[in-house]
């Protein structure tokens, strides 16, 4: 009887959570509709055309030339979820921008979430954060065992942006948090040196 009661309580909790949040996939897995590419000024049509591509439910990034692909829409309060892996045999520099501002330059104004090996989860950028004018850099939290997975394996990142609050989880472990003066902006994925793949890119927001 107690077991049945416990299972019922768990089921109710799951139902409440699912009813309270709605997933919005910002990458459809088939093409790059809803995204805009920004590359270095000297990138020509040949080298830049395939920097970002969509195939087999994956967004693929070559890493060359430098630049990023951003959403066409701006977003305010959300929790961003995405999964990625390095595909070139070694970890490379990479990043995700949140609260990205207008301008469409290769080194934009926004909050960059570092995806570099051994610096995973660091926050940096030119926006005012924690009451300090940019440029800004906050190291990831020191944890007993790094939650980062080896090259070739899928990592999961969750990035909460709610008002001025920011929190970052890497594979379920809280690795960073800060406050940011910007409360709205684009979301972007960098091309910065080497190949990576992304999947399951979506937002959850309270209804």
Where are these regions (language model features)?
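Bacterial N-terminal signal peptides that target proteins for export
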Residues: 1-7
